[in-house]
Amino acid sequence: MFKTPVSVLVVIHTPDLQVLLLERADHPGYWQSVTGSQNPDETLLQTAVREVAEETGLDATRYPLTALTNWNIQNRYEIFQEWRWRYAPGVTHNTEHVFGLMLSNPLAVTLAPKEHLQYVWLSWQAAAEKVFSSSNAEAIRKLALRNF
């Protein structure tokens, strides 16, 4: 089954703007926030909750309703050639929907070893510099402008 070319990006952060980053297992040195494709018959919010659980072991539903928010930001980008085999033939672009998950403080997370090698909590400035994706960097920079 092919992936749907719709995904979520979930920036996990604290009130003082520390940001959780994960290092990709399939590309060591590529750091990112939680990301993942939407499954059929799944809402974007359900996708965000599922991806956070799969990639960090955190249950986003255990936090206040205001902790996980849809930032109403969409990014359309070209799918890297090396990852296009995951999508139906002819699919070249993905639409990413940005969410934030605010935790009261940095937490230890449980990584999915096939997906990520390690994690780190960084200031928003350092996190924006470290991520490989420009849309991820932009979302982290926008974090500093949000009112919590």
Predicted region positions:
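A short gly/proline-enriched turn/hairpin at secondary-structure junctions
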Residues: 32-35
